[in-house]
């Protein structure tokens, strides 16, 4: 059992250790100690407050309007013995038992406690308490508390939220690039504006094909390509001309 270690600063809340869950909360409960250890005045008198039941312990928080040396009182199940539920005829039901002091709990020895439920619910609270204590015996003590994350792990920058609905992992097969594949060298940029990919069926040029020499450019303005299936005739222009505008070909020079 520990004294004044389980309440918030203004006593309007309870401090529950990591790994535990809140099972029940009862208001208007009176706590007293018919038998207490000598040499401590924190157990004197009757305290009124709220009783909390977690998966590993019982915590009592005195009302914030009450001034006294005891602000909170915590009792782990493994330090409680002789637990009973009393049902007086002309008084409210109460839970009674013996509690041992916990190491570094703020007091030493043992004491007998009494919890009176002015709003009812003592039997239900005791049943849940026994069930939770049985689980502790079966599964062991609570796990170690979760501490702060290691240095360097902070909150994500603004704008980084959860992915939209339907967004999942990439399809299988998308992994690292094969060995030898690296980034493009400096100067390799994207295609110019207006560039379109070649239509389907255009593949790599045949072996032995070389690029045309420098200076070979496209046809001058006004020239159009020959219709499909028409090959170029030797020593004739590929451009169509009217009969009256045909150019005379120069005579071949004699060798």
Curated annotation (Swiss-Prot):
Region (Disordered): 180-199, 204-255
Leader sequence segment: none
Protein name as annotated: Postacrosomal sheath WW domain-binding protein
Sequence repeats: 139-145, 146-152, 153-159, 160-166, 167-173, 174-180, 202-208
One function term, GO molecular function aspect: transcription coactivator activity
Function: May play a role in meiotic resumption and pronuclear formation, mediated by a WW domain-signaling pathway during fertilization.
Domain of life: Eukaryota
Ranges for domain GRAM: 15-87
Extent of motif PPxY motif: 171-174
Lineage, top ranks: Eukaryota, Metazoa, Chordata, Craniata, Vertebrata
GO CC, alphabetical: nucleus
Pfam families according to UniProt: GRAM (PF02893)
Region (6 X 7 AA tandem repeat of Y-G-X-P-P-X-G): 139-208
CDD domains, per the entry: PH-GRAM_WBP2 (cd13214)
UniProtKB keywords: Repeat
InterPro entries named among the record's database cross-references: GRAM (IPR004182), PH-like_dom_sf (IPR011993), WBP2-like (IPR044852)
